[in-house]
Structures are given as structure tokens and as C-alpha cells.
Regions:
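A short, N-terminal "cap"/entry segment at the start of jelly-roll beta-barrel domains
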Residues: 1-30
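Conserved short histidine dyad/triad with adjacent acidic residue
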Residues: 31-48
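Short beta-strand His + acidic residue motifs that chelate non-heme Fe in jelly-roll/DSBH
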Residues: 43-45, 63-64, 84, 89-95
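Glycine- and acidic-residue-biased ligand/ion/polar-headgroup-sensing regions
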Residues: 50-66
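Short acidic-glycine-tyrosine-enriched beta hairpin
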Residues: 68-86
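Ligand-binding loop in jelly-roll beta-barrel domains
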Residues: 86-110
Length: 112
């Protein structure tokens, strides 16, 4: 049964490729995660079938998204957000550690 409310202390804590993350709400088709980054964390260029929408709570990050018509290379700061379509190559580098909230649709089994 799907959990409607997840209290802070109930969040499932995981480590994925050296990054600490909390699996927060998990719905039927999507999930919310809180990524806890430290300076030097990175994700090399990769793709996954999940749409990924994120909100930068704190820290500074370099996001690269390889769109066919125009590649994007941008610095993200607190308050910025992004939406990466599924199966789109992208990479992520942590400049200053902090927290990012990500929503994945469908949910990522490797984060559960």
C-alpha cells in the first residue's frame, strides 16, 4: 500500500554511487528524493528512462544536458529548478555541497 505521508524520520536513507539520498514520498508513478551532495560529487554523462525534475535547495552545481538542437551547460544555485526529459544524456557536478529535491517519473527502482 502506498504511504500517503512520509515523516522526516521515516525517510529511507540510501547511498547511491557515493551520494547520500533520502527516498521521500513514493507514489504509484513518481517519487521524490532529497539528494545530499558534498563538494566533489558528480554524475558522469548518463541517461535513464525517467523524467527528472529538480529544485536546488542549497549549494551550487553544474548541469549539462545534451539536447539534440542545443546542448545546455549551466550553473545552478539555490532556488533554481530544472526538468530533464527521459532518455536524455546529462551530467552533474557539485561545486558547493548542499541539497537538491528530485522528482522522478516513473520512480527509480535503484533508489528504493
Amino acid at each position: 500500500m502506498q504511504k500517503i505521508v512520509v515523516r522526516k524520520e521515516e525517510a529511507q536513507k540510501r547511498e547511491f554511487k557515493g551520494v547520500s539520498l533520502d527516498s521521500l514520498a513514493v507514489g504509484e508513478k513518481s517519487m521524490v528524493t532529497k539528494m545530499n551532495y558534498v563538494k566533489g560529487n558528480f554524475a558522469t554523462t548518463h541517461r535513464h528512462p525517467h523524467e527528472q525534475c529538480g529544485y536546488v535547495v542549497s549549494g551550487e552545481y553544474r548541469l549539462r544536458v545534451e539536447l539534440e538542437d542545443k546542448p545546455i551547460d549551466v550553473l545552478l544555485h539555490a532556488g533554481d529548478s530544472y526538468a530533464i526529459p527521459g532518455n536524455t544524456p546529462h551530467s552533474f557536478e557539485v561545486i558547493t555541497g548542499g541539497e537538491v529535491i528530485d522528482v522522478f517519473t516513473p520512480h527509480r527502482e535503484d533508489y528504493l
